[in-house]
């Protein structure tokens, strides 16, 4: 397998995570080209803009994965966007598993025939290409979500990411920073339990109480569904891989058999080879249309949960500010600072509540449209493959019965 791989911009990129994100947006973003160099992928990001804060109407830059993560982190850390669902960061490109499989295949090629080796090598190269295309698509969806959002697309760092032609000098997070992020996640989870459990804070809006209950359960269920969908997809892929040796064995046996059986064995060998290709397509389609979609919305639902936590934290701060103001008035000391603090907390809580309600409704609409589109397409593809498999078996049966 080549260590460098390039995807042309006019090739179709798989997209299972969304329906038409860009529409009539004044900011159109796409990844027109990508090059893989061992562990790094360089994405060519092309932008067409009708927004006044860009210097040009069309421009392109080359970005790496770490720069996408930097952009995501700047949104998460910006208080201005606390009331918004921040689109999930794209996953890190990971081609190591495919490379290891190919290396093991090369090391153990003495135990298999040249034909088996060639077919298995083609399968692994196709797997590598599929991972590469999905990597490009996930990075593109992240940018398109930002570009389609009326608030997020006006962010200064987003403009820099899209327009600044030089390298952003963003390095990969070190071990300490990764552990720090994990620690913050643990602290946040503990804080949420403390707010809702020990302190006994009561939700003041039924809409958000319902959304929080729903998202906690939904996130768990979509994670479990994703794991099971992955197992089904891998089963189809394993079946496809297992057709290779049986096809080769039948073909080899056919060359040794008497003429009355030779054609039958060769016909069966051809059947298993064509079934292998069909099973491979089934696995690929289930991975793209189901597993990838579930995996994306597992991350997106986590982003929605993060939004609800920020609002809940704002509610707790507002309640604490009210208590502090009551104490200040009782003691008749530092009343004005307590009033200012209470007003700021109130304003922040109301601002987050207003934007969060719209964001959660948009999340529902986006999720329904995406699932409906992909599940319909998956069912159509499953039917198409089932018909092809049935026709293949029927033709093989006719051929076998017609032999003397």
Curated annotation (Swiss-Prot):
Comp. bias regions, Polar residues: 11-20
Domain PX: from-to ranges: 21-168
Biological process (GO), any one: protein transport
Transcription listed as a keyword: no
Basic and acidic residues bias: start-end ranges: 1-10
InterPro entries noted in UniProt: AH/BAR_dom_sf, PX_dom, PX_dom_sf, SNX5/SNX6/SNX32, Vps5_C
Top-level taxonomic group: Eukaryota
Alphabetical keyword list: Coiled coil, Protein transport, Transport
MF-aspect GO terms: phosphatidylinositol binding
Residue stretches in coiled coil: 255-336
Chain residue ranges for the region called Disordered: 1-29
Annotated function: May be involved in several stages of intracellular trafficking.
PANTHER family listed in its UniProt record: SORTING NEXIN FAMILY MEMBER, SORTING NEXIN-32
Family, per entry: Belongs to the sorting nexin family.
Name of the molecule in the record: Sorting nexin-32
């Amino acid at each position: 397998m080549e260590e460098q791989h390039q995807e042309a911009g006019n090739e179709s990129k798989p997209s299972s995570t969304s329906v038409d994100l860009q529409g009539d947006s004044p900011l159109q973003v796409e990844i027109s080209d990508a090059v893989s160099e061992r562990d790094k992928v360089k994405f060519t990001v092309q932008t067409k803009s009708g927004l006044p804060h860009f210097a040009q109407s069309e421009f392109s830059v080359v970005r790496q994965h770490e720069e996408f993560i930097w952009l995501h982190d700047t949104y998460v850390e910006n208080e201005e966007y606390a009331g918004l669902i921040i689109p999930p960061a794209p996953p890190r490109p990971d081609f190591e598993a495919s490379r290891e499989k190919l290396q093991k295949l090369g090391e153990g090629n003495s135990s298999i025939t040249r034909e088996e080796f060639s077919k298995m090598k083609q399968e692994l190269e196709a797997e590598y290409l599929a991972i590469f295309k999905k990597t490009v698509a996930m990075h593109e969806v992240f940018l398109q979500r930002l570009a389609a959002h009326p608030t997020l697309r006006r962010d200064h760092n987003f403009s820099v990411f899209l327009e600044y032609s030089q390298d952003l000098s963003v390095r990969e997070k070190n071990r300490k920073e990764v552990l720090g992020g994990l620690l913050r996640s643990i602290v946040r989870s503990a804080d949420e339990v403390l707010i809702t459990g020990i302190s006994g804070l009561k939700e003041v809006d039924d809409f958000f109480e319902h959304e929080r209950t729903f998202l906690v359960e939904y996130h768990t269920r979509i994670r479990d569904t994703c794991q099971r969908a992955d197992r089904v997809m891998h089963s189809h892929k394993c079946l496809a891989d297992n057709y290779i040796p049986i096809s080769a064995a039948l073909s080899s046996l056919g060359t040794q058999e008497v003429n009355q059986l030779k054609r039958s064995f060769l016909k069966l060998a051809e059947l298993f080879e064509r079934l292998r290709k069909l099973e491979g397509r089934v696995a690929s389609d289930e991975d793209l249309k189901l597993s990838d979609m579930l995996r994306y919305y597992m991350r997106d639902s986590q982003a929605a949960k993060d939004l609800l936590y920020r609002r809940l934290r704002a509610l707790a701060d507002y309640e604490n500010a009210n208590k502090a103001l009551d104490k200040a008035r009782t003691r008749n000391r530092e009343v004005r600072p307590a009033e200012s603090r209470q007003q700021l907390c109130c304003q922040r809580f109301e601002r987050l509540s207003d934007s969060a309600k719209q964001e959660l409704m948009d999340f529902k609409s986006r999720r329904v449209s995406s699932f409906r589109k992909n599940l319909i397409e998956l069912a159509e593809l499953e039917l198409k493959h089932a018909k092809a498999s049935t026709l293949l078996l029927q033709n093989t049966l006719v051929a076998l019965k017609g032999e003397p």
